[in-house]
Amino acid sequence: MVSFSYKGNLIEIIEGDITDVNCEAIVNAANPSLMGGGGVDGAIHLKGGKTIDLECAELRRTKWPKGLPPGEADITSGGKLKAKYVIHTVGPIYRGQEEDAETLYSSYYRSLEIAKIHGIKCIAFPAISTGIYGYPFEEASVIALKAVTDFLSNKEGYIIKFVLYGQARYQTFVSLASDFLMAYNP
């Protein structure tokens, strides 16, 4: 684990399984149906159990009948997970267009806004959209760091954890974060 101070907040980078992270909330790289899928989404639904499935079904029924739009976020309990909450967000399917970056930024930023509304100060993120959705990892990492630091720019006391699966992604993210935070943390 590597950690950085940022304007009265803490940014941690961890290699591991996001479902095992100790944090008030973990972020799910969901699909629009909110009903589980592969990767992080499938792992969260599997480990979190029926409670998450039922709460997601209720969100679909009452709030998102056409599915959770890309760049938007919503919240459920954490079910059987260590985290008390799961913040579900849908990242973009990468097509190499400017809107992809805007949508990915929004996925991170909206997740943080949802956390703030619920008084959550410890949030763990996976690398949204970098799996089956095909977003280039390094580009997505810089967007994630930008969204998080923009959100934290006038706040204190937050702990943001980036949880990366695999040593190569972890090392790449640590290097990018170090460069990014040195440039944007006067």
From Swiss-Prot:
Q: Which PROSITE patterns match?
A: MACRO
The record's InterPro entries line, in alphabetical order, gives: Macro_dom (IPR002589), Macro_dom-like (IPR043472)
Q: Which Gene3D superfamilies match?
A: Leucine Aminopeptidase, subunit E, domain 1 (3.40.220.10)
Residue span, Macro domain? 1-181
| Similarity comment | Belongs to the MacroD-type family.
Q: Which Pfam families match?
A: Macro (PF01661)
Top-level taxon in the UniProt lineage:
Archaea
Please give the positions of the paired cysteines in each disulfide bond: none
From the broadest rank down, the organism's phylogenetic lineage runs: Archaea, Methanobacteriati, Thermoplasmatota, Thermoplasmata, Thermoplasmatales
Name of the protein in question: Uncharacterized protein TV0719
Query: Which SMART domains does the UniProt record give?
Result: A1pp
Residues spanning the signal sequence: none
